[in-house]
Structures are given as structure tokens and as C-alpha cells.
């Protein structure tokens, strides 16, 4: 089975885009699930068109494949805040970064690598806590 690496990002207009790290495929949508579905539709459309027109396409489209999705920390934070699942207060507690700074990241300020790592570490810790509670 072939594994495809894809990255999920949140655009400035609030939509999401998904793109393959090493391939030409991408998708967009108003939610993460919509963007994933759009990319899969694009992959199938590309294969179908390639067969009809007689040009080459990536061989993995004829095989079983899986897509591993990665989302950057800021896009993940935006997703949960916009969905009303987490608040800035809650994210402050899991990351140790004050709400005012988190708000600025949600609104366009790019965090330094250390701050981005702290956000990622906080979400991983939250994931682990939830995993062990429900495992």
C-alpha cells in the first residue's frame, strides 16, 4: 500500500486547503472534511481524464493507497476555536501561551518556531489525555 503525505492549512478567508506534499493533487472546502473529499475527487477526476485522453498519471492511483494528513498547529487551533470546541482560555491552559498572544496568532501574526512548538506540544498532550481516558 502506498502512503501519500498531505498537508491541511486554513486559508485567510476561513476555508481549508489540502495538498499532497510530493504530488500535484489538492482540494479546498469550507471544512477540513470538505477539503479532503475535494482532493480525493480531484485525484479520481485526474485518473479518469488521463485514461480518456491517453496520458500518464501517477501509478499509485491504480493501487490501494492511504493518505496521511498533517495540519499545522495554528490551523488546528483556528479550527477548534471557530467550531466552538475550545476557547482561547482553554488553549492558554494547555500551551502556557497567554490568550492575547494566541488571539494574535489566530488573526495573522506568525508565531516563532518555539511558540508554534508549544502549541503543538499542548495539543499532543491534550490528545494523550483524551486517548487514555477513553482507551
Q: At which residue positions do the language-model features occur?
A:
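DNA-contacting interfaces and partner/effector-binding or oligomerization modules
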Residues: 1-55
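Short, charged, surface-exposed hinge/linker loops at domain edges
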Residues: 2-3, 44-100, 104-105, 109-112
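A generic structural signal for ordered secondary structure
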Residues: 26, 42, 88-91, 123
Amino acid at each position: 500500500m502506498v502512503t501519500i503525505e498531505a498537508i491541511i492549512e486554513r486559508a485567510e478567508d476561513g476555508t481549508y486547503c489540502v495538498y499532497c506534499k510530493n504530488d500535484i493533487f489538492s482540494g479546498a472546502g469550507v471544512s477540513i472534511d470538505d477539503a479532503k473529499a475535494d482532493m480525493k475527487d480531484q485525484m479520481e477526476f485526474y485518473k479518469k481524464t488521463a485514461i480518456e485522453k491517453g496520458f500518464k498519471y501517477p501509478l499509485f492511483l491504480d493501487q490501494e493507497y492511504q493518505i496521511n494528513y498533517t495540519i499545522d498547529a495554528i490551523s488546528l487551533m483556528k479550527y477548534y476555536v471557530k467550531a466552538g470546541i475550545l476557547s482561547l482560555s482553554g488553549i492558554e491552559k494547555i500551551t502556557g501561551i497567554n490568550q492575547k498572544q494566541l488571539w494574535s496568532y489566530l488573526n495573522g501574526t506568525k508565531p516563532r518556531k518555539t511558540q508554534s512548538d508549544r502549541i503543538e506540544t499542548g495539543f499532543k498532550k491534550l490528545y494523550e489525555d483524551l486517548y487514555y481516558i477513553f482507551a
